Amino acid sequence: MLRVSIAFIATIFLFSGCADKVATPLTHNLDKKEGIYSIKQAKSINMQELVNQVEHYPVIFVGDHHNTEKTHKFFAEFINELGKKGYNLNLANEWFTPSQDELLKEYTDNKFNTETFKKKVDRDKFSKYKREYVSSLYEAIKNNSGRLYGMNISKEDRAKISLREFDKMSQEEKYFYDNLDLNVTAHKQLIYPYLKHCDKMPQTTLESCFDRMYRVQVTWDTYMAQNTSKIANKVIKTPKDKLLVFAGALHIEQNLGIPLRFSRLSNLPFISISNEKIENDKDLKIDTNKADFAYIYESVEERSK
């Protein structure tokens, strides 16, 4: 009887102890060195190894750190190395909308140069980020006989959804709005910490700032995923065809933004690449679910500290 009692108490202690433990995120703890890290393999790799490892993936999601020169140079080099392997390259970019596809085709068809392209696009109306960084990507695609595609929603259409201006929406836009999935809890956990600025903003509508801004994030991800699927159906025909999807890292990481919604529309295999910035005052830790690969870089500002 005593043995049974002891065993019973031990069992209770064991399971209650497990219940009290809080799971901590799993990370790869690394030395602060620039380079490419394969999260899938838990090891550093070089550019050629990265190119070889994406061979069987027709869709490649790339997370961008805006206004960061090094990450754009890395991606431009990646594009050029893929070109050397004879891949047919297509780049879908969040800085353009599908309505600009004809203009993008004229650019890649060499009907005008990059300077003229900048003037025609008037990208400053669409983004405040430095266009000279992303221009290297467009040039790399053009130089490798590739194609550029727009995939983002326009500011005007996004505003209708943000402000719930149903009277201004077409039937197609209303259908899009009604079918936004705002209930992916893991995605909310990822995004909400970045919406803290809502606490400081004046309440202008009955709806909370958090809810409105989160709906905008889901709108971006859903719209870009839908266009990624359309473009993929159009351009992925042979093992040599690649679709590179370039958007802000928060749209790509953890496979919870564009990739999640893309996977609901397409069975094409995909792989993801993101970035990790080295910071002087923090250990270098990469979340195991961040992406399949991470480009680790040190900014000029951090190096000078």
Where are these regions (language model features)?
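N- or domain-start disorder-to-order transition segments that initiate the globular core
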Residues: 4, 18-57
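Short internal beta-strands
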Residues: 90-96, 272-275
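Zymogen propeptides
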Residues: 42-43, 47-84
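Beta-strand elements within well-structured catalytic alpha/beta cores of enzymes
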Residues: 57-65, 90-91, 141, 242-247
